[in-house]
Amino acid sequence: MDCGPPATLQPHLTGPPGTAHHPVAVCQQESLSFAELPALKPPSPVCLDLFPVAPEELRAPGSRWSLGTPAPLQGLLWPLSPGGSDTEITSGGMRPSRAGSWPHCPGAQPPALEGPWSPRHTQPQRRASHGSEKKSAWRKMRVYQREEVPGCPEAHAVFLEPGQVVQEQALSTEEPRVELSGSTRVSLEGPERRRFSASELMTRLHSSLRLGRNSAARALISGSGTGAAREGKASGMEARSVEMSGDRVSRPAPGDSREGDWSEPRLDTQEEPPLGSRSTNERRQSRFLLNSVLYQEYSDVASARELRRQQREEEGPGDEAEGAEEGPGPPRANLSPSSSFRAQRSARGSTFSLWQDIPDVRGSGVLATLSLRDCKLQEAKFELITSEASYIHSLSVAVGHFLGSAELSECLGAQDKQWLFSKLPEVKSTSERFLQDLEQRLEADVLRFSVCDVVLDHCPAFRRVYLPYVTNQAYQERTYQRLLLENPRFPGILARLEESPVCQRLPLTSFLILPFQRITRLKMLVENILKRTAQGSEDEDMATKAFNALKELVQECNASVQSMKRTEELIHLSKKIHFEGKIFPLISQARWLVRHGELVELAPLPAAPPAKLKLSSKAVYLHLFNDCLLLSRRKELGKFAVFVHAKMAELQVRDLSLKLQGIPGHVFLLQLLHGQHMKHQFLLRARTESEKQRWISALCPSSPQEDKEVISEGEDCPQVQCVRTYKALHPDELTLEKTDILSVRTWTSDGWLEGVRLADGEKGWVPQAYVEEISSLSARLRNLRENKRVTSATSKLGEAPV
């Protein structure tokens, strides 16, 4: 059934360009109606915004603009008072006009439509909803018909004159204003009513509302004349092959939509030229950025879902057992961590959070042919793109809301500001370019896109910005604490900024640590892609290269941070430790502090009878480095006097778990050897069980090969996963992020454990309160199998000939 209007009401099919008659969608609050607006007779020169018509052409004899108000402009022009363009007529009389009073302009507020514009000009009025002036903020947008997509040259070139030169200023904040002489009235013979299905109506209205004020910007900037308009339309449709429009209708390109109160929630306001002709320096509107959640919110949701996956049994038909992923079938809804907040994003009118939700993907029928493993692979790739948009969203808040605050800049000095925010703007720019390339790759082939080669290409840029930012993290933390204590204005200004809804009342520190969290998360996302890539394929090689590059970058960042801390510790200790006798060169680039602390030395009293052993106790302080051990006594002013030192190879430790002759406490025996002979022997007592075990583990560390055997697939060892982020407070502790999996080596009765992280083989101590045990045997075996899969791929790449 043809729902289109009669040919007599479609003059654009036979008449000259620009006279096309289009239905207009009018939205007031939550009431929707589609109808033709009655013609409005302008009593005076009219403001014509956004239409590139020269004043000379308007006054030229015979011009189609001089004959009257064309159909596309009926109901869209706000008449001005006879006084000029500086006043506008409202229901209450004349008042000064506002700049950019067109709905497509920033902060547009069209005049109220409840009453006549002037007592002298009683024109036909549109209905008012609810009768309230506050609820009369109307939005108007073009709704393109299906038949206009292939044939209408004005689908993008809205009201574009043939041969007209369009200037680049079409995207500026204030559009050119042209006065139209004459008051010839052209009215509709019979307003046409259209019926739309509920889904089609909501799809069209939702997509139009999300586009914002510059709905015609693409056509106005693409070129000059009708030919340029046609070219702009064709290239725009090609570039948006994955546009999320379920009914496949043409629509304008995204404009400068404002969301939030900051000025940089997007990549750029520049127009998107054809993909083939776009230069490397040009950027375009991100498809995901404007509607993405903050990265902090994404990270919490994604981590929670990964924790559930790592605990889950592999018994159900939809679980991740290898045999269950091969058969074809529709994918489950929770293939991606992003799916946990699908409802939130849909309520906000956002873009798609799952690859399978893209209309082009659903309409292609590919979901019925892909295996569950392949579907999860595509979702893992898609999550990398959407999470990058969330990351840039949070960086935009940090740069625009905090760094861009005039009050905060006035409070801070130039040096403090540099130390506090470091290279955050450079990190944001690098991520914007990365997201742009990712989106272009997605648009090129939405069904079979790849991202690992894009990640690999951007790794050098990541290193240039992430390495110095993460390295300066220690100075950043110190500057923040010093400003809180020494700058009286800083806490108050910061508290007001953190209470703003722009940052969702999140603290500044949660934004400053984002770069290190992101580079770690990015490695994890690429690792998830590698786990699901077919073995022996070219995609596996590319994913492995990207994973290795990110892994090396993370290790380099960690090493850089540790190197600074270790050097500072050695410099600090060298001022406090004094040797008795031989001078020991303490400061060395190859030396770092492993553990230090005070223990109790127990020694038998010489006068005590043999039948009744009595022990004397005195404090001894231990400084354990990676290559030597120093035993010293505390002196005044916090200094230490070393009386014994030994190399690591000369140490032996025995755990005296049973009480010796009724000796209370947690005791162990330390022996210092010289060749094959014992040189010194100390009976030491710790305060807690965990302290004793940590000293024994540090004094006699296991080899890296032994640590690898702990996480081998053939041996089922206890596993725990991190449920709360933990930052190491001592050198022998392990910093953990959510979802990290540890293979446990030692448990203590007072709430500590020693484990080896599966992802990188790092060993350390963590409080048990920050982890939970993985009780499922099948889940533990799956975690070991996935770790072996990644290890095998990386080792195979290392063995390949160059």
From Swiss-Prot:
GO terms for molecular function: GTPase activator activity; guanyl-nucleotide exchange factor activity. Residues 592-704 form the PH domain. Residues 245-269, 306-315 have a biased composition (Basic and acidic residues). InterPro entries: DBL_dom_sf, DH_dom, Ephexin-like, PH-like_dom_sf, PH_domain, PH_ephexin, SH3-like_dom_sf, SH3_domain. Residues 376-560 form the DH domain. Residues 316-325 have a biased composition (Acidic residues). GO terms for biological process: regulation of actin cytoskeleton organization; regulation of small GTPase mediated signal transduction; Wnt signaling pathway, planar cell polarity pathway; wound healing. One of its GO terms (cellular component) is cytosol. This is Rho guanine nucleotide exchange factor 19.
